[in-house]
């Protein structure tokens, strides 16, 4: 019974990690409100989870802010590229879907744009963790994240399905 009240026991360590994850989620959420900073916030989230939560080092606020500032420029560039791709493909998908609803045969090409958006999302799954983990040029980050996504296609598909399930759960609740 004396070990139960010890702050270093497994229960309190686990509780501390849960609180850290909640705080990190709040940091990430508030820094994603201005859409431009979402890439840097996501990179900082991955960096902090890896360094503080997994490896039990340092403090979450300090590490999150350090990673946010350090990776801000590169993450923002990658995020804006990704947003531009999503905007173009989303617009094309919407227009072609409207053509398909109107009975135009070429409108069925919206499926191609939807699949391209799916691949862009699977690529994005690896972009920000890659930036958080490695220092590289932006062009190499984009290339290597794509190679990782394609090289681990089944795991990437599983991550994509989990991401869709999480998005659906947030939408429902």
Model-derived features: positions:
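Conserved, surface-exposed functional patches that form binding/active-site neighborhoods
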Residues: 116
């Amino acid at each position: 019974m004396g070990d139960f009240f010890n702050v270093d026991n497994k229960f309190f360590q686990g509780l501390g990690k849960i609180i850290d994850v909640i705080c990190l989620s709040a940091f990430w959420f508030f820094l994603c409100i201005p859409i431009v900073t979402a890439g840097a916030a996501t990179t900082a989230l991955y960096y902090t989870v890896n360094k503080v939560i997994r490896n039990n080092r340092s403090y979450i606020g300090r590490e999150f802010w350090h990673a946010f500032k350090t990776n801000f420029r590169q993450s923002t560039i990658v995020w804006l590229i990704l947003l531009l791709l999503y905007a173009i493909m989303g617009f094309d998908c919407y227009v072609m879907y409207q053509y398909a609803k109107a009975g135009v045969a070429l409108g069925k090409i919206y499926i191609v744009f939807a699949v391209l958006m799916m691949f862009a999302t699977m690529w994005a799954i690896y972009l920000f963790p890659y930036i958080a983990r490695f220092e590289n040029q932006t062009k190499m980050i984009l290339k290597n994240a794509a190679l990782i996504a394609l090289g681990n296609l089944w795991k990437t598909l599983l991550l994509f399905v989990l991401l869709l399930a999480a998005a659906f759960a947030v939408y429902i609740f």
